[in-house]
């Protein structure tokens, strides 16, 4: 049997690239194993595991794993091959048809065109004069150093970059079209990250995916990434990342028929994948169903489950609610579902399910009468919350767009009732389809009762508490919703406040719920409600003394002042509760909790009564502390400042916190207007540095703006690096540098207001700063210079002080992958490699190897192509060191590790290049090629 199979397989290598292979033919055509023959043999049990392995190897596929896994790989290969052949045949036919049409069309006569310029701005003429003057051009553009940040290869398609760069799609498009040697997309992981990121269903995204598929397909590129080589894997990835747009365009671009998709679904997609239902999963499910590409095993039911709060969120737009309803109803035939349950009796029908089904069926009939075109665009794009806040129980007026749907005079339906029906239908859908034991997980959200049940607030509270039966009842959501609902009468809100303070709800309240209620009152920012609440509280403090620890209204106002969101509330407290509140006391510290947007108005109120705010160091500070400190420094008439010696240490944490929050200008403003009495220690750089997000770059530019390479050289010279007497502290040596501030580095509004006279406030000297000192480790010094595009300065320091910078305790850490990997472009990495080649010694050989590892892991194929093209470099860099070849630098294991790094990062084009060039043994070559197969 194996020998016969062997004959079939031996013909595969010579035939599996032919375009005329017919996967639907029976048997073996001219000795060629077809998909139909392969599947027939497997299904009949005549193909054993060993034969499957032989077939997989012959097709260039991995042969490891269980029998079913090997079979899936082979079937995936045949499916991709079928799609690829169809695509090639279609393109060939289209080209022939186009050629025939061109031959039939008369050739147009040649015309001469004259290029003229109209309405050219005068300044443009000057631009072209400068642009065409080579001397001026070179002088101007010599100041632009974009080698580091302009290089595509520095970017890569990792998720951090894609998420943090607003124009990442445009950059990828530009890179694909440029077709240069430095490609952003280097491996399948990058493609997967793109599929995970770009999901918007618009023309721009569709066009992007068509460009992507065109660039990376077998008909247009020699890249190792070819979508049509792994049709099954990419369909799996797109469904896994829930990307409808990519999947839709992928199927259309490669003209994948429904039978292929069904087979892929059976092989790779678990039948329950759509069970954990989401809005976007339903879209894919219904799409596959509409193109007849869902196998019978992949029905939405009986696996369905969901987080109902997301479907019914009142923050969703109205049009999303409508689509959610339609997708759920379209996804399954409920009547058929009920009949199946009755006949098969596999799932016992709960009596209430039949009742739910009848109700749902009635609502569906009613909603079918409503067309989406009846709603205005404003309504469809408004959130449910906003629509409900503008609807009324009546439907007699059409003057306000949000009150009623667009309709005839005889069909003026209330929008609130329509929304309620959509909500109710979605709830009923899940009640009909889930087991009664799990019904509690599909309970209507609290906001449903608050918006759609017409009863008093008091009765509403009793209803929802009983409905939740004490389990996870959200008092905060209830109180805030009631107090902020503009459709609820003020008297009912006053009654709620009275009932809470009179302990009417004490049986259902926990102690903490009272604090939640207080917070809800203050967060309403409704002056009438707050005033009513405070007056009752002043009249009966003893009644709630045991319930709350804050019966004093002054403390309550202070503790919840962070919730104030408008000037009118501040004015209300100032005019009515100034004496009771601590908010306007002299030397108070409560001001630190007031929102920054209101702080200027608060300063005005304090200044008007001649009182000052106190700012001293406390162990606690929020993310806006440095901004508040900057205000305090600039307004000495409103603030009194005093810090002890601990602030120097705490300030390092403040700098770290503000960098992580992208508030580097706050740090710069502070250092421009206050002098620390000790050098700023930048040890936090070690943990905060994040090259992907571009954080710290503004701050680093500020620090090193006026620090020359010569001044750095002077500081480095004083470090004692004698090997015979260095100790631990010397190994960890730091250098102290001085940043000189000039008009160009401190041109901020804050500096214009900076106090002219210096003032000592403990560990700080307040006043405009001319310079300040900071300490930094040598390793982070190199990282900062690298980020500032000052690699030329690093190489200058290499030449001047090799005994310092090439000390293993500093430089080896700098060249380690975790430190330099994320910031290394191929341009600068190649500069380092070439420098080390020209200055070889025991240390630089290690650094050279580290840089080669980074280049391999990042997929910098061009660096290795340049090395290979140089006979001299390639002989001792990419050839194995042996007894007969001592000129080579690296042994077989080290070179093997370089290749493995490229394989592990899915840079297979580079992997194959290195495997073919390096003189590995046949055994090692085969081993590395198998690693590639297993990684695909």
Swiss-Prot record:
Presence of the UniProt keyword Transcription in the record: no
GO-annotated molecular function: DNA binding
Comp. bias (Basic and acidic residues): 1-19
Residues in SAP domain copies: 44-78
Keyword terms, alphabetized: DNA-binding
Region annotation (Disordered) ranges: 1-30, 91-110
Protein family (similarity comment): Belongs to the UPF0746 family.
Protein name: UPF0746 protein DDB_G0280787
Organism of this sequence: Dictyostelium discoideum (Social amoeba)
């Amino acid at each position: 049997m194996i020998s016969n199979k062997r004959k079939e397989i031996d013909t595969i290598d010579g035939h599996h690239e032919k375009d005329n292979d017919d996967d639907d033919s029976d048997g073996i055509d001219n000795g060629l194993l077809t998909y139909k023959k392969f599947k027939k043999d497997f299904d009949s049990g005549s193909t054993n595991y060993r034969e499957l392995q032989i077939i997989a190897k012959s097709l260039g596929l991995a042969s490891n794993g269980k029998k079913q896994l090997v079979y899936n790989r082979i079937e995936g290969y045949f499916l991709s091959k079928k799609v690829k052949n169809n695509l090639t045949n279609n393109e060939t036919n289209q080209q022939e048809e186009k050629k025939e049409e061109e031959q039939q069309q008369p050739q147009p006569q040649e015309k001469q065109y004259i290029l003229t310029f109209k309405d050219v701005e005068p300044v443009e003429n000057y631009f072209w004069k400068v642009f065409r003057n080579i001397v001026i051009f070179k002088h101007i553009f010599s100041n632009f150093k974009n080698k580091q940040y302009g290089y595509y290869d520095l970017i890569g398609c990792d998720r951090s970059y894609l998420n943090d760069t607003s124009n990442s799609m445009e950059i990828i498009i530009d890179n694909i079209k440029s077709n240069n040697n430095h490609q952003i997309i280097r491996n399948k992981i990058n493609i997967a990250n793109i599929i995970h990121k770009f999901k918007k269903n618009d023309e721009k995204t569709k066009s992007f995916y068509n460009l992507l598929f065109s660039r990376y397909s077998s008909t247009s590129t020699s890249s190792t990434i070819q979508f049509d080589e792994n049709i099954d894997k990419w369909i799996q990835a797109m469904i896994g990342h829930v990307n409808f747009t990519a999947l839709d365009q992928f199927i259309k671009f490669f003209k994948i028929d429904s039978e292929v998709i069904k087979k892929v679904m059976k092989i790779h997609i678990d039948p329950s994948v759509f069970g954990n239902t989401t809005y976007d999963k339903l879209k894919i499910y219904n799409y596959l169903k509409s193109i007849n590409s869902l196998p019978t095993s992949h029905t939405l039911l009986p696996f369905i489950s969901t987080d109902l709060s997301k479907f019914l969120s009142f923050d969703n737009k109205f049009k999303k609610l409508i689509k959610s309803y339609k997708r759920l109803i379209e996804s399954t035939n409920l009547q058929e579902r009920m009949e199946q349950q009755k006949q098969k009796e596999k799932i016992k029908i709960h009596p209430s399910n039949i009742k739910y089904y009848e109700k749902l069926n009635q609502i569906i009939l009613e909603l079918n009468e409503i067309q989406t075109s009846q709603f205005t665009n404003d309504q469809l794009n408004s959130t449910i919350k906003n629509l409900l806040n503008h609807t009324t129980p009546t439907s007699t007026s059409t003057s306000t767009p949000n009150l009623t749907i667009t309709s005839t005079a005889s069909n003026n339906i209330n929008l609130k009732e329509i929304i309620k029906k959509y909500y109710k239908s979605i709830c009923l859908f899940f009640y009909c389809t889930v087991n009664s034991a799990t019904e509690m997980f599909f309970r209507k959200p609290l906001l449903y009762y608050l918006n759609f049940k017409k009863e008093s607030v008091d009765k509403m509270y009793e209803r929802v508490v009983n409905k939740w039966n004490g389990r996870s009842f959200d008092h905060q959501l209830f109180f805030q919703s009631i107090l902020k609902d503009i459709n609820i009468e003020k008297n009912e809100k006053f009654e709620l406040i009275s009932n809470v303070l009179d302990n009417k709800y004490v049986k259902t309240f926990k102690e903490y719920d009272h604090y939640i209620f207080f917070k809800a009152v203050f967060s309403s920012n409704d002056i009438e409600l707050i005033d009513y609440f405070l007056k009752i509280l002043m009249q009966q403090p003893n009644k709630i003394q045991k319930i709350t620890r804050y019966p004093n209204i002054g403390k309550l106002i202070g503790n919840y002042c962070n919730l104030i969101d408008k000037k009118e509330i501040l004015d209300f407290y100032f005019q009515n509760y100034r004496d009771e509140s601590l908010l306007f006391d002299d030397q108070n510290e409560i001001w630190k909790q007031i929102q920054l947007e209101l702080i200027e108005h608060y300063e005005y109120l304090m200044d008007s009564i001649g009182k000052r705010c106190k700012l001293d160091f406390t162990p606690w500070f929020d993310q806006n502390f440095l901004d508040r400190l900057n205000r305090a420094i600039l307004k000495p008439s409103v603030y009194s400042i005093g810090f002890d010696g601990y602030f120097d240490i705490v300030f390092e944490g403040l700098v770290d916190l503000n960098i992580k929050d992208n508030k580097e200008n706050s740090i710069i403003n502070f250092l421009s207007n206050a002098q620390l009495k000790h050098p700023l220690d930048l040890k936090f750089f070690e943990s905060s540095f994040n090259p992907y997000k571009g954080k710290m770059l503004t701050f680093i530019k500020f620090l090193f703006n006026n620090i020359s390479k010569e001044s750095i050289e002077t500081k480095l010279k004083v470090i004692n690096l004698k090997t015979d007497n260095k100790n631990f502290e010397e190994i960890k040596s730091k250098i102290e540098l001085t940043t000189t501030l000039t008009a160009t580095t401190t041109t901020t509004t804050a500096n214009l207001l900076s106090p002219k006279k210096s003032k000592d406030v403990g560990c700080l000297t307040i006043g405009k700063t001319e310079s300040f000192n900071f300490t930094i480790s040598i390793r982070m010094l190199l990282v900062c210079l690298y980020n500032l595009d000052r690699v030329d300065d690093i190489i200058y320091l290499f030449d001047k002080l090799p005994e310092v910078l090439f000390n293993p305790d500093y430089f080896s850490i700098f060249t380690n992958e975790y430190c330099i990997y994320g910031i290394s472009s191929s341009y600068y990495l190649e500069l380092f490699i070439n420098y080390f080649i020209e200055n070889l010694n025991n240390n630089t050989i290690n650094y050279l190897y580290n840089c080669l590892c980074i280049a391999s892991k990042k997929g910098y194929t061009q660096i290795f192509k340049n090395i290979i093209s140089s006979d001299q470099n390639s002989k001792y860099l990419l050839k194995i060191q042996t007894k007969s070849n001592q000129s080579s630098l690296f042994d077989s294991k080290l070179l093997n590790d370089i290749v493995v790094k490229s394989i592990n990062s899915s840079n297979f084009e580079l992997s194959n290049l290195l495997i073919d060039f390096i003189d590995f043994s046949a055994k090692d070559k085969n081993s590395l090629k198998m690693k590639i197969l297993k990684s695909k």
